[in-house]
Curated annotation (Swiss-Prot):
GO BP annotation list: gene expression; single fertilization; sperm flagellum assembly
Origin species: Homo sapiens (Human)
Protein name according to UniProt: Cilia- and flagella-associated protein 119
Subcellular localization, as worded in the UniProt entry: Cell projection, Cilium, Flagellum; Cytoplasmic vesicle, Secretory vesicle, Acrosome; Cytoplasm
Keyword hit for Transferase: no
Modified residues (Phosphoserine): S34
Higher taxonomy: Eukaryota, Metazoa, Chordata, Craniata, Vertebrata
Keyword Translocase assigned: no
Region (Disordered), start-end ranges: 236-271, 309-331
Length: 331
């Protein structure tokens, strides 16, 4: 009877302990999931903060975007910027009315106030006039303007020189509209039209490539700094109180030159030891090179003097006839 009661009691106790362990495991799993979720949220927030900070830094620092982005893949650009309705509007206008309609279609602000907008408008106006002179269709004119605009974007993507990359990109896009190979390229232009369009872009845009880059890209300056291995950079000596007082006295003398004051000369600043050693080394090397050059010059001067003296002695000798020719025949 006791054994049955004890076994029942032990079974109930083990069951309660198992239930307690399962509850602890559930709570631990919840805590772990919450910890992982918070960690993921913190990582996401840190990533977003880092990306926003990097973007802000790139916007503030003009040198962050110094290197050019990769050029896009050459693709068919028909109806890319000027669609069918836009081309019909331009077709109805004359050369004088074209500027206003084109400024509205390209969403240019005020060409009279903005130099860049005026240059862009002139670029596309002359391109449209060229297309009219060549007798291009609406599709060909739209593709030519889109090709020129993509080339202009590739040019102004960086302030550095990328004329070779832009020319390769231009020829690749040009061939996308001259060879029938769908969906990669179409035969929109004939061979003569392709050659005429290439000559026009080369003689107009690529001829003034640096001018477009100068106007549409920020100015970049490259500063050169030299550092010597094994030497620390020179430290700026702090101004002492005597130097501050002397500067004040000099200012007072400039304001009131009639008052006589004692002139004080600031003691020369002691040079650091490593700079003195470097200057001494440079002086010795320069003196050695100068001595070698002086010796070479003296040797060449001596050799030239000897050659001149030998020539002079040869000229000063009396002219002697060869034997047999100077004797007269006796009868």
């Amino acid at each position: 009877m006791l054994n049955r009661k004890t076994s029942h009691f032990l079974g109930m106790r083990v069951q309660s302990e198992l239930e307690h362990l399962s509850e602890l495991r559930r709570e631990a799993g919840k805590d772990r999931s919450s910890v992982h979720g918070s960690a993921a949220r913190t990582r996401a927030s840190v990533r977003t903060q880092w990306t926003t900070a990097a973007a802000a830094k790139a916007d503030e620092d003009p040198g962050a975007n110094l290197f050019p982005p990769p050029l896009p893949r050459p693709r068919i650009c028909m109806w890319k910027y000027l669609d069918v309705h836009s081309m019909h509007q331009l077709e109805k206008t004359t050369n004088a009315e074209m500027r206003e309609v084109l400024a509205e279609l390209l969403e240019l602000g005020c060409p009279e106030q903005s130099l860049r907008d005026a240059i862009t408008l002139d670029l596309f106006c002359h391109a449209l006039i060229f297309c009219r002179q060549q007798g291009f269709s609406l599709e060909q004119t739209s593709a030519a303007c889109a090709l020129l605009q993509d080339l202009h974007k590739a040019c102004i993507a960086t302030p550095l020189g990328n004329v070779e990359e832009c020319y390769r990109y231009f020829t690749s896009v040009l061939f996308c509209h001259g060879v029938r190979r769908p969906p990669f390229s179409i035969d929109l232009f004939k061979e003569e039209q392709l050659l005429a369009l290439e000559d026009y872009v080369v003689n107009t845009y690529f001829r003034h490539f640096k001018l477009y880059k100068y106007v549409f890209t920020p100015q970049v300056r490259l500063d050169l700094s030299l550092t010597y291995m094994g030497l620390q950079p020179p430290k700026l000596w702090p101004e002492s109180e005597t130097e501050k007082e002397e500067s004040k006295e000099m200012e007072e003398q400039a304001v009131t030159p009639q008052k006589e004051e004692l002139e004080t000369v600031a003691p020369p600043e002691p040079e650091p030891s490593h700079i003195h050693v470097l200057r001494a080394y440079i002086k010795t090397q320069v003196n050695k090179e100068l001595e070698q050059l002086q010796g070479l010059v003296e040797e060449r001067l001596k050799a030239s003097e000897e050659r001149l003296s030998s020539k002079l002695t040869a000229l000063e000798r009396p002219f002697q006839l060869p034997p047999g020719k100077g004797k007269s025949k006796t009868k």
